[in-house]
Regions:
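…primarily DNA-binding HTH/wHTH and HhH modules…
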Residues: 84-100
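Short hydrophobic/aromatic patch on the recognition helix
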Residues: 33, 37, 81-82, 86
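Terminal helix-turn-helix DNA-binding modules in bacterial transcription factors
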Residues: 7, 11, 16-20, 39-77, ...
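Short coil turns linking two alpha-helices in DNA-binding domains
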Residues: 29-30, 77-78
Length: 100
């Protein structure tokens, strides 16, 4: 089940995916999904989603995609939220990462 959920998340990164929506998709409770991630992945569902979005963002940045387009393409509702998450995760800004 966890592998299927992880694949679902990967396929829907650009959209607004929530724990409840994901649980409904797999006909389980939100707490079941949450427990699976905590026990098997060592992170929360939302942390996993954010990490996957940021990994996808790094790829797009290195491909030369405009940063505001990157943020939208990986499911962030605005650039400032993307910027904060990226900087918190990697310790550098997306702009700085682009120059590396």
């Amino acid at each position: 089940l966890l592998d299927e959920i992880m694949s679902y998340v990967e396929d829907h990164l650009a959209g607004h995916i929530t724990l409840d929506d994901t649980a409904r998709q797999f006909h389980v409770s939100a707490s079941t999904v949450s427990q699976l991630f905590r026990k098997r992945m060592g992170v929360s569902y939302y942390r996993f989603v954010t990490q996957r979005r940021l990994i996808a963002a790094k790829t797009l940045i290195k491909e030369g995609t405009a940063l505001d387009t990157v943020a939208e393409s990986v499911g962030f509702s605005d650039y400032s939220g993307f910027y904060r998450a990226f900087k918190q995760e990697y310790g550098i800004s997306p702009t700085r990462f682009k120059t590396l």
